[in-house]
Amino acid sequence: MQPLEVTLKRYLFRLINGFRSGTQYSPSQLPIDSFSRILIIRQHDQLGDLLIATPTLRAVRRKFPNAFIAVVVREYTASVVENNPYVDEIIVFYEKLWRWNIRKLILFWKMLRNDFGCTIVLNTISRSLSSDIIALLSGSKYIVGPDHLMLDPSLPEKIYNVPIRWPSVQKHEIQCNLDIVRALGADENDFEYDLVLTDGEVNEAERIYQSLGIPPGKTVVGVHFGALNPSKCFPLEKLVTVIDWMIEKFNVEIVLIISRNEIERRKIVLSTVHHKLHSAPVMPLRIMAAFLRHMSLVLCNDTGTLHITASQRVPTISFHSLSDPVIWKPPHPRHIAVRANDWLITSITIEQVQEAVITAMKQFVEKPAS
């Protein structure tokens, strides 16, 4: 966070503390059996962060099978939890001020003030003041959150009146989210993500895939090369070398998968690669998720696309820089992370990627051609 942002958040935190009771509850003091309406807030992060939290949504539902469960998310991540069987209602928080109007404000307030007995704030890496304010505005008597993200350590914690002790050992982000609700007796051993698609979305993705003219029976590898942060983008010249090598060694069909921000980068790939590639059109998130089901393997950077692909149980090879894959990579064995020792994306070698491809093809796809 920038210094000005930190100062502002600390000021607001102090202001809130001045008006809120300091009464705290341990998880054992909670009337858990009476929680018939539960609010879960995970609105301050990116697509991948929300998908990582879906096992926690599943855990809460299984602990409270008859409860009404609502989740607060950002507008651009809301489609991740559409059709989720463990969520009854999606409450959208608009990040941009200009996206709000009177009708949206009234609806947001009405949905938020819905007699929630317990609010759970899934803060893990950083503390979101907007999430804290939403939790307070919900009117819940009990607000559950981690105890390690104090904006001002000199003040007592008054927003999370059910503070959950944070573990001192390093864990995967899925485990970190689950730790917050384990105190309520909710747990989950299945770490697969939930992104549940409709038949219409699957059919539209099928139509798009068929339009590419890929011969039946061929092994199809998807390649997504974008990221908003340039430090997370595997160099295109190295990626092109890997693509040509994969086609020659494994006789695969390569499909380039892009967003609107990656059209120019796709032109660079197509102008430098030595083999014919297929290009998928820009697709909405959920259609893209359905489209990814047609891939035998996906190569991508450490972005939301990695986690979207994982949600459809498709093997991946992902390129990582500053974010530790031990913490952030989908934890399932079918996902292989590639990272340089100096954590620089530009230091990842072609040989590292080729080794990962060979492993993935042997273990999850098919044996290499002789």
Predicted ranges, named:
Residues 1-370:
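Catalytic machinery of carbohydrate-active enzymes
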